[in-house]
Amino acid sequence: MGGLGTDHIFGYASLVLDDGGRGTLARLRGHRRVWGVATDNVRAIPGYKMYLERSSGSRPAVYVAFVDLERREGSAVGGLVRPVSEAQLEELDRRERNYDRVEVTGQIEGVDQGRVWTYRGSTEGRERLRKGREAGTAVISRDYLEKVLAGFERLGADQRRAFEESVVGDLPVLDLERIDLPA
């Protein structure tokens, strides 16, 4: 994997499929997967995204949930580690608006050189999901779920099964179309 001083990203959900699913299988100790953050689909944020219902074309007043990490002693999350440049990290920081980039080098099994980063839910992203759960309007986008499952399927049926068994959640899945908004 790259020499000392090289930055890496640990993907545990949709980032597994980025870069064609290339990277090294690894495990992040002390965490588990949850549906932990959300975006407020009522707000239109330039340069971000919104969702439309495929069946009607309408924009539902929902909070769209995404996979997050939750600290959990004795647990571990499988994923993919790949090297990234500083420019790639900056681009990921812009893209992963519901998350904060955190260093997890000492908690990763499978990479022995360089720094390893991952994205853990931001306070704001977690608060949005809490509001959506309280209002009964937190949902999962079918496309997002299928992208995550496809990423793990590319790593092998056992990896997909491990993902399915590891994610904790109870939210409904809606057929939503993602619309990227201009900046």
Residues covered by each model-derived region:
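A glycine-rich, hydrophobic/aromatic-adjacent loop/helix-cap motif
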Residues: 2-183
